[in-house]
C-alpha cells in the first residue's frame, strides 16, 4: 500500500516527528490531488522538516530534501512552494538540500576532504537554497569594531516582487541553520 510514509525517508533508526508526518502527508496529497504537479512530485521525498518562529508572529516551515534530488525540486520550486504555503495556511515554506560538514583531516593523514563538505561550501550552499528562486549577485562582509561581522547579501532585483516579503524569513532561517547574521538587499541599478 502506498502511503504518505513513503514521502519521508529518515536516517536508519529514526522515526519521523508528528510535524514531519504532516509535511509528508501534504506532499502525498499534492501527488494525488494536483494534476499539474503529479508527475513531478511522484519520485520526490523529504529527509526532515521543522517549523520555526519568524519576527512578527509569522512562522516558517523548513523542509530538508536529499542533495541528489535538489535539481528536481528546483524545477518545480515556485509551484511547489505556492501549493505548500496554501496547505500550511500562509506559513513561509523554505526548501533546503541536506548537506554534511566533514571535519578537516588530521595532520599527516592521506585523506582528502571534498570541497563540497567544507563548512564554507555548506554554508554558501544553504544560503543559495534559502533565497531560491532569487540569485545572489553580490556579497559583502562588514566587520564591526567590536569584532562582530554582518554579511550583506545582494539579491537579483528581477526577483524582488517574489522574494521581498520573505526577507525576514530568509534571515531567521539562515540564522537558525548556520548561526550567522545576514542582511539581504537589492542592488540599485545605476543609470548612465
UniProtKB/Swiss-Prot annotation:
GO terms for biological process: ribosomal small subunit biogenesis; rRNA processing; translation. GO terms for cellular component: 90S preribosome; cytosolic small ribosomal subunit; small-subunit processome. One of its GO terms (molecular function) is structural constituent of ribosome. The keyword Ribosomal protein applies. InterPro entries: Ribosomal_eS7, Ribosomal_eS7_CS. Belongs to the eukaryotic ribosomal protein eS7 family. This is Small ribosomal subunit protein eS7. It comes from Secale cereale (Rye). The gene is RPS7.
Amino acid at each position: 500500500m502506498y502511503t504518505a510514509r513513503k514521502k519521508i525517508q529518515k536516517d536508519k533508526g529514526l522515526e519521523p516527528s508528528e510535524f514531519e508526518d504532516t509535511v509528508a502527508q501534504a506532499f502525498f496529497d499534492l501527488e494525488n490531488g494536483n494534476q499539474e504537479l503529479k508527475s513531478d512530485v511522484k519520485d520526490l521525498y523529504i529527509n526532515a522538516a521543522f517549523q520555526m518562529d519568524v519576527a512578527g508572529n509569522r512562522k516558517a516551515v523548513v523542509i530538508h530534501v536529499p542533495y541528489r534530488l535538489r535539481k528536481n525540486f528546483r524545477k518545480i520550486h515556485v509551484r511547489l512552494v505556492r501549493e505548500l504555503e496554501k496547505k500550511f495556511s500562509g506559513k513561509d515554506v523554505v526548501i533546503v538540500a541536506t548537506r554534511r560538514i566533514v571535519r578537516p583531516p588530521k595532520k599527516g593523514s592521506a585523506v582528502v576532504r571534498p570541497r563540497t563538505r567544507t563548512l564554507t561550501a555548506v554554508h554558501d550552499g544553504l544560503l543559495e537554497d534559502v533565497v531560491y528562486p532569487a540569485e545572489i549577485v553580490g556579497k559583502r562582509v562588514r566587520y564591526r569594531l567590536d569584532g562582530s561581522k554582518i554579511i550583506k547579501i545582494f539579491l537579483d532585483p528581477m526577483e524582488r516582487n517574489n522574494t521581498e516579503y520573505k526577507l525576514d524569513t530568509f534571515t531567521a532561517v539562515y540564522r537558525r541553520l548556520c548561526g550567522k547574521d545576514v542582511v539581504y538587499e537589492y542592488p540599485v541599478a545605476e543609470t548612465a
